[in-house]
């Protein structure tokens, strides 16, 4: 899990939000899901076929949902009151595991 004191408005341009914000994220560092990389051509400049296969394993899905819930708990804690604004992504209405 990491927290940075800004958030990105547009990932393509890397422009920051126009208001004070933060980004908090979690990662499954030892995933069970397996992806693949396959060579498609003898040409060394040709792009390989990459299948990331993120979150294919239920263990990874559960870890990410748990991490997300932990992030919300940390941000909702009283010591964060002075710094916390409204959650805008994914938004406070997202509550069910399937939505997360």
Annotated model-derived regions:
Residues 1-100:
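FAD-dependent oxidoreductase catalytic-site/capping-region signature
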């Amino acid at each position: 899990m990491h927290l940075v004191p800004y958030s990105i408005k547009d990932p393509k341009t890397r422009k920051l939000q126009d208001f004070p914000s933060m980004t908090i994220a979690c990662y499954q560092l030892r995933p069970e899901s397996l992806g693949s990389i396959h060579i498609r051509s003898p040409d060394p400049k040709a792009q390989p076929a990459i299948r990331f296969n993120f979150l294919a394993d239920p263990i990874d899905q559960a870890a990410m949902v748990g991490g997300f819930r932990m992030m919300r708990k940390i941000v909702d804690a009283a010591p964060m009151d002075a710094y916390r604004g409204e959650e805008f992504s994914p938004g406070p209405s997202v509550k069910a595991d399937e939505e997360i």
